[in-house]
């Protein structure tokens, strides 16, 4: 796809390191090798798009494939992620072109929904996005953490530590058992569980 000398295309598998360049620059962040390896394992190159001004990569974005719970079932969804345009190429319609590319790709795949997590949500209202939820992160000091209500002892119920392999087997089953009852819950791939939920980014 070419518009006003800006060309869009998916990166080849051996271009994935370069693909992340505009995203890292747009957020003023360096991507470590472990972070790159994590993202490389999660993203599908054919769902990634870069914008080029001549031979220079000036923007990048991507979409994850996942299943989204909706009332009555689940649908395929595109998880838009990593939207970045270099500062010297902003206000030239590159974001709009990449979003159109990702949306068209989602339509071709039969995906009914596109979602994204945004650092600046107002940017994406022009593309039809609205706030669906918020996120919060909490840290608990184990020395002072308590159940809200006392839990009566029950010898038939036990708590035990599990290693990563067992967690990777059990946690997805528990999650998937309840996910179907929670509209807006997202399916997670095995790699997503291992790399993000269980912390194996090596």
Indicate residue ranges for each PLM-predicted region.
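Residue-level signal for alpha-helix termini/capping positions
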Residues: 107-108, 201
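Conserved active-site alpha-helix within GNAT-family acetyltransferase domains
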Residues: 108-112, 117-137
